[in-house]
Amino acid sequence: VLGANEEFNQSLEKAGRATGLSSSHARDLARGTLISAARLLDQTNEEPDELIRKVASPGGTTEAALNVLCKEGAGLDELVLAAVEAAHQRSKELG
């Protein structure tokens, strides 16, 4: 879904500002996070699950964030599925 990464980046920036980061620091961290993730996916043959295991230290900040994003029944998977289904339905309507 084109625009999803940009939307996620915007959400990361907003969250950074909401937790006290300056606008420029929030922007830099959000963009750096997405760029680094894209590079890892592009430059390795590893599956996303394996990369997640490598970057999420047990008890660390990444793991804490992923626990929220991946909460079953109310997490990122459900949001992404709903977004893809909406785009798919609209595509069918448009022909």
Q: What residues fall within each predicted segment?
A:
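Anionic-ligand binding region
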Residues: 1-27
